[in-house]
Structures are given as C-alpha cells and as structure tokens.
Amino acid sequence: GIRGIHFLDSGNYHYVTGIMTEQIKQGFSLILFDHHTDMQKPMIEHMTSCGDWAGKVLKTNPWLQQLILIGPQERDIQQIYSEKEGLVTSTELREKLVTFSAEEIQSGEAGNKISKIKKNFPVYISIDKDILDEEYSETNWSQGKMSLPVLERLLMPFLKSGNILGIDICGECQQGMPLPQYLEAEEINGETNKELFDFLMHYSHM
C-alpha cells in the first residue's frame, strides 16, 4: 500500500508518485515539494514522465481536491499558467492548484496564500530533494536553495494535521558520476535521508 515513507531513488522516478496516488479512493490533497513544477506539456500524449506527471495528476485524478506545489521558481510557475504553453488554463484547474514559489517563501509573501489551503482532506506528501541547497542534497537535476530546517518547518503544519495517507521522497544522485564525487554525494544524501526520515516518522506518526 501507499502508507508509510517510501524512497523512490532519483528524481527520474518522481512519476511513481502519480501511480501511488492512483491507489487513493477518497478525496485528498497532494502536497508536492519540488524545485521543478513537473507540469510540462507532455511530449507524447499517453506517456508519463518525470517532467509532466504532476500535471497529469491535476488534470485526471478524480479524487484530487487540491495540489499544493511548493518550491519552484516564480518564472516556472508562471509558465504553467501561460495561455499558450501552459497546462493550467481552465478555471477548475486553477482553483485546484495552490503554488508557493521559492521567491514567495524567501520573502515571506507565501503567508498570504495559506488561507487557500483546504484543511479538511487527508494528505499525500511528495518531496523531491532537488528543492534543497547542494549543502543538503546532491541530485541529478538543477536544485533550489532551501535549507533542510526550512523544509521541515514547511512540512510541519501538514504533518500536524494528523491525516497522512503516505509520503514519498526522491532526489538521489546520478549513478554515472566519478567515484569520489559519487561517494561524497551519497554521504550528503544519506545524512539528509536519515534526518528527514526521523523527522517525518516522529511528526507524522506513521
């Protein structure tokens, strides 16, 4: 089942979250922490990739009540709303999606949107560690600048809701790296994984 904390390997496999959420048969919110929106227009209509899976969940999952996207840059978020290129053009989808850009989190403006979060649904939490600064995580994609303590602070209100359906974490490093860098990256990621796992176990009561 989806209950518990699942590690999904590198961000290439983030589309597995879409498969996990297909198992949910009740109204729920997806809380997505990611440096990327994962809502590009699909290159091939019936194939799901790490770049478009979240957009497909938003458009097609009948049980999804809200998708809360935390961490991409403002310019990437604007792109998903653009009339020409964007995925989220209908009013229905716009109402389902709440976004908090890296810039809004840094400036404190994110607080203005908190009232938009629906609190009466269970949540599934998905974390891509590419949201973190390289001090905390070494991934195979471009990364954000968030610290681990800030990520934990942002997770806390969702964990305290006490109604967690499941949690997944991706963002491991690329295996084709030269060995010294790979070992160093594995060490950084291992420490962050342990810290995140302990934190999530403690506060989510999974």
Question: What are the residue ranges of the model-derived segments?
Answer:
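Catalytic cores of soluble, metal-dependent hydrolases
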Residues: 1-8, 12-29, 52, 62, ...
